[in-house]
Amino acid sequence: MPKTALLRPSSDGVAADLMTSLAGLLREWLPRQRWFAGKDRPVTDLALLSMTELYPGCLHLLVHTGHPNPSHVGLRGVPAPGGALSSGDCYQLLLGVREQLPPGLGRALIGRAHDGPLAGLTVYDALYDTRSAQLLLERLRHPGTVGPLRFEADPSVRVPAGLAPRLLDAEQSNSSLVYGDAFILKVFRRIQPGVNPDLEVPGALAGQGCGRVPAPVAWFRTTDPFAATLGVLQPFLPDASDGWTLALGALAAGHGFTAEARELGQATAEVHLALASAFPVGPLDENARTAAAMTERLEAAAHCVPALQPFVPGLRTAFRALLSCDVGPPAQRVHGDLHLGQVLRADREWFVIDFEGEPSRPLAERCGTQSPVRDIAGMLRSFDYAARQRRPWRPEWARRCREAYCAGYAARADWDPREKHGLLRAYETDRAVYEVLYEARHRPDWLPVPMAAIERLAVRGG
C-alpha cells in the first residue's frame, strides 16, 4: 500500500507527525518562492494548521510560518536587539507525494523526506502536476466537501470537463492555473481569516452588472482552523494584454499612450461607481487619521531601508498637508493595489482584475472603506514606473499619460483628481514609500525607480 494512503484527515497522529517529514524541506523551499512574503525575515518556526488528502498522493496543507517581529528586524532578516519571535503567516500548499518525481516536474521538486510518515517519498508542488491540476478542477466542477474544504460554484455557469491546465509563470503573490484558455483559477498562497476580496468584490460587481470585472465561476474555502477563502475560478481572457505590457510596447515603439490612459481612467471611474453602489459608502475620510497612518508607515519603512531616511522630513510635509486640504470624495471600497499590471485590455476594452489589495496589509484593512484617490495614485505611479524602464527616461510620456488618465476619470466621475492636489500628493507619497519597501525586499535592482519619485516628492513637492 502507498504510504500516502495512511494520510487521511482522520489520522490525527499521522497529521501531527507530518512536519517531521516536511519541516526541513519547507524551510529551504518556502523562502525561494515568489509568493512567500517573509523573504526579509528568517523562518523561525513551522506549524501544521490543517491537513487534508484531496486524493491519493496530493495533500492540502495550511502551514504557519513564524518570523521575528517586523518591528525588531532589519531589512535582511537580522533580528535587532530585543527582537521577539511573535509574528508569522499562514500559507496554503498543495503537495504531491510519490516515490519518484513524475517526468517533466523538475521545477516542482521540494525534496525527498528522510523522516516521519513520508520518509523515502518525494515531495513536490502539486500545482505543476497536470493530473493534480485536472483533479482540482473536477472538485470545483462538482461542488461538495472534503474534510474542512468546501468547493462551491455558480450554478448558472457550466465549466466543461477535460480542460487542459497550465500554470502561469508570471511573477505574482499567488499561483494561477489556466484551463483550456477558458478559465483561470487563482490559488491564494498567503491565507488570512475571512472572505478574500478577490472573491467578494468581483461577485458583488457582477450583481451590479459591471462588465469591467470577470465574475467568479467557482471557488473553494476552508473552515479549519478558521474560515477563509482559498481560491477563485474566473473566466480567462485569452487575447488580452495587461496594461504594463502595452505601455512598455508603446514606449519601445516611440508611441504615446494617452488614448489608452484616458480610457483606463474612464474604466477606473466606472468600477469605483459600481463599488460605491455595491458596498456601503463610508464617511469623508478623517485626514488627521490618514496622515498619522501614512507617517507611521513612512517611519517603519525608513527603519528598514536606510536610503529612505534622508528624505523623511520632506515626505512628512506631504502628509501634514492633509490636515489643511480638502477631504475629497467619501471613503468607499476600492481596488487597493491598482497599477498597470492589474488591468487587461481585450477587444479595445479595459478590464480590472486582482482585487486582493496590497497583500502585506491586514485583510480587515483591505476590506474597509478608503479614499478612491488611493487607486488613482497607484495608477499614476505605475505610469512613472513604465516610463523609467527605458533610457533615457521619458518624463513627458508619463506626464501626458497621467493627465489623460485623470481627464478620463473626471469624465465619468463627478469630481476631478487634478483638483485634489494635496490628497493626490499624499497618496502618491504613501504609495512610493510602499514601493521602496517592496523593491528593497523583493527586487533590489528596481529600487532606484521609486527612490527617484521619493526625491521628487520630498524635495519638489510633487
Residue map of PLM features:
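Short Lys/Arg-enriched alpha/beta "domain-start" segment
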Residues: T4-L48
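Conserved ATP-binding subdomain of kinase catalytic cores across diverse folds
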Residues: H67-T295, E299, R348-E349, E356-R391, ...
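An alpha-helical support segment within catalytic cores of ATP-dependent transferases
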Residues: R150-L163, L298-V334
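Active-site catalytic-loop/activation-segment of kinase and kinase-like phosphoryl-transfer enzymes
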Residues: P283-A321, R400-A410, L437
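Pre-DFG segment of protein kinase catalytic domains
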Residues: R333, F351-D354
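Conserved catalytic-loop position in the HRD/HxD motif
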Residues: D337
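Conserved protein kinase catalytic/activation segment
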Residues: Q342-V352
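ATP/Mg2+ or Mg2+-diphosphate-binding catalytic cores
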Residues: E396, R400-R418, G422, A426-G462
